[in-house]
From Swiss-Prot:
Activator of cell division through the inhibition of FtsZ GTPase activity, therefore promoting FtsZ assembly into bundles of protofilaments necessary for the formation of the division Z ring. It is recruited early at mid-cell but it is not essential for cell division. It is found in: Cytoplasm. This is Cell division protein ZapA. SUPFAM superfamilies: Cell division protein ZapA-like. Pfam families: ZapA. The keyword Cell division applies. One of its GO terms (biological process) is FtsZ-dependent cytokinesis. The keyword Oxidoreductase does not apply. InterPro entries: Bac_CellDiv_Activator (IPR053712), Cell_div_ZapA-like (IPR007838), Cell_div_ZapA-like_sf (IPR036192), Cell_div_ZapA_firmicutes (IPR023688). Signal peptide: none annotated. The lineage of its organism: Bacteria, Bacillati, Bacillota, Bacilli, Bacillales. It comes from Bacillus velezensis (strain DSM 23117 / BGSC 10A6 / LMG 26770 / FZB42). GO terms for cellular component: cell division site; cell septum; cytosol; plasma membrane. Its main location: cytoplasm.
């Protein structure tokens, strides 16, 4: 979507309802919320005694870690492509 038009939707993350606004489609925003919910539940299975705040922070750390690893892989692939040119 990303045409500058704002979309508003309600999502459920870890039993909490959130209204989010973005430039992507409602389906995309719901998918993102679902991934966050899944990640929180995955971490909670391994650490069932974490309070919600610590669980949220640990989830954010894990997601940013995954993002940074993908970004590094992307940069490596980009360099490899430039070397072949």
């Amino acid at each position: 979507m990303s045409d500058g038009k704002k979309t508003k939707t309600t999502v459920n993350i870890y039993g909490q309802h959130f209204t989010i606004i973005g430039e992507e489609s409602k389906a995309h925003m719901r998918h993102v919320a679902g991934v966050v919910d899944d990640k929180m539940r995955e971490i909670n299975e391994k650490n069932p005694y974490l309070d919600i705040n610590k669980l949220a922070v640990l989830t954010a750390v894990n997601v940013v870690h995954d993002y940074m690893k993908l970004q590094e892989k992307y940069e490596i692939l980009e360099r490899q492509l430039k070397e072949k040119e």
